[in-house]
């Protein structure tokens, strides 16, 4: 079981209202698109959620196509491109260190983030959307006890 926040749905399981899909400009061809579309939709006043009681079997863990460490590295890069609030990203990386492969997965996330900074990768979101995302992430950090050890319901 993989944890996702209640307002995020993994890419292959997404459905959209027609008006929302039009407003967000469709599915953008960027890494982390399934997070980008959620942020833009919610910034525009749409509600987003997942349905954890609907069971779906993925054939592999998210981000593991090229191996878990490459997935962690890419996750760090996507996080930078999406404009993650740095303290939130650091907390997320530390949280990743608590899962296999222990410690090194979080280190690879940080390396991916740093590589994206140094290579000046372009942002996937506009400044207004990044501000919206960071406000959400600051709220999560302030209420971290609700999320720290949470897993989705079975």
Question: Which residues are covered by each model-predicted region?
Answer:
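Non-catalytic, C-terminal membrane-associated alpha-helical segments of glycosyltransferases
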Residues: 71-154
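A recurrent flexible, glycine/aromatic-enriched loop bordering the glycosyltransferase active site
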Residues: 1-23, 74-80
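Short, charged helix-to-loop "capping" segments that act as catalytic/coupling loops
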Residues: 26-29, 100
């Amino acid at each position: 079981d993989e944890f996702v926040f209640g307002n995020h749905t993994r890419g292959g399981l997404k459905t959209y209202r027609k008006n929302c899909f039009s407003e967000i400009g469709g599915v953008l061809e960027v890494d982390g698109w399934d997070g980008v579309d959620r942020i833009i939709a919610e910034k525009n006043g749409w509600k987003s959620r997942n349905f954890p009681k609907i069971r779906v079997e993925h054939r592999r863990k998210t981000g593991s196509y090229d191996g878990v460490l490459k997935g962690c590295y890419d996750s760090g890069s996507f996080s930078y491109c999406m404009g993650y609030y740095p303290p939130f990203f650091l907390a997320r990386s530390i949280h990743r260190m608590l899962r296999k492969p222990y410690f090194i997965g979080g280190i690879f996330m940080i390396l991916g983030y740093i590589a994206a900074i140094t290579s000046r990768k372009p942002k996937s979101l506009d400044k207004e959307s990044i501000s919206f995302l960071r406000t959400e992430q600051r709220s999560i950090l302030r209420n971290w006890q609700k999320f720290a050890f949470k897993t989705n319901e079975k």
